[in-house]
Amino acid sequence: MNLSEELDSIYQEAIQKIGSSISEEDLDKNKNDFIGKKGKLTAVLKNVALLSIEEKKTIGQKANELSKKLENFVVETKSSLKKKLFETQAASEFFDSLRPLPNASNGSLHPITQIQYEIEDIFTSMGFSIMDGPEIETDTNNFGALNFTDDHPAREMQDTFYLENGNLLRTHTSAIQVRTLRKLKPPFRIIAPGRVFRYEEVDASHEHTFYQIEGMVVGKDISAANLIDTMQVLLSRIFEKEIKTRLRPGYFPFVEPGFELDINCLVCEGKGCPVCKQSGWLELLPCGLIHPNVLSHAGLDPKEWTGFAFGLGLDRLVMMRYGIHDIRYFQSGNLRFLKQF
């Protein structure tokens, strides 16, 4: 028997053996017997080196073709074995569709999501629309169009997550303010909830990822009195009780004048704690009248249109409502904590 005939004989034997495999373990054994490192077909291939150049070409090509055919046949056989096993198990198993399910705990909304929906309801009842925007933003939308100077500290890499293409993870939902000013014709009232990112040192009151709701009203003769009234309505409906607040001057490039609305810390009731950094007060709501440069950048005449804007931190709002002393709980995924809400 020459080498070519020997290859044909081995191939036929392999087809018979592999095809008669009764399990995946049996299949693996039969495969190794023929095309494994010490298999019969592999042993023949080792003798090809002893042949003439012409025979090497012919026998080598034939051996490789048969080896590939056997590899494919092994795959087909394995698939067939799996199918037969499934059919056998399916035929022997019985599923009672009327059987009562075991008790399973129901899921629930995250406390931040709950308060977001609640705030959305409050503002939509006052005629506000809800807007959305991408979490990956351009430098222009996040900074430039909001009147941030090129050398503003917030643009630096220690405060902002920049991407390789020059875009960034938005640092505030104010970026949606820019998109809205371009998209809508005034007058309008909008809120824009979303997740924001800052390169923060994480502690009890700071996270690198947190949630805000941006609010903006644009119309004619909008004043600080309209802003303060809107904030008072919001806080009274959120906390359902009298909340001690203070309004102090604050600087934000996109508003003029700018204010900081602080509330008396509800975690320590104003006595001082890590959440309020022992001050008894917590910065909750930076706000102000929209800067004329922001309106001009969007193509609006600041002599004709005015407005106010605010940014509300949802994480801190939830902390105040429930007396939570550490903002890191929200991102922890701890079900013992989350199931309380």
UniProtKB/Swiss-Prot annotation:
Disulfide bridge partners, by residue number: none
Keywords noted in UniProt: Aminoacyl-tRNA synthetase, ATP-binding, Cytoplasm, Ligase, Magnesium, Metal-binding, Nucleotide-binding, Protein biosynthesis
Enzyme Commission code(s) on record: 6.1.1.20
Keyword Protein biosynthesis belongs to the record: yes
Name used for this protein in its record: Phenylalanine--tRNA ligase alpha subunit
Keyword Aminoacyl-tRNA synthetase tagged: yes
GO biological process: phenylalanyl-tRNA aminoacylation
UniProt source species: Leptospira borgpetersenii serovar Hardjo-bovis (strain JB197)
Subunit structure: Tetramer of two alpha and two beta subunits.
Cofactor(s) required, per the database record: Mg(2+)
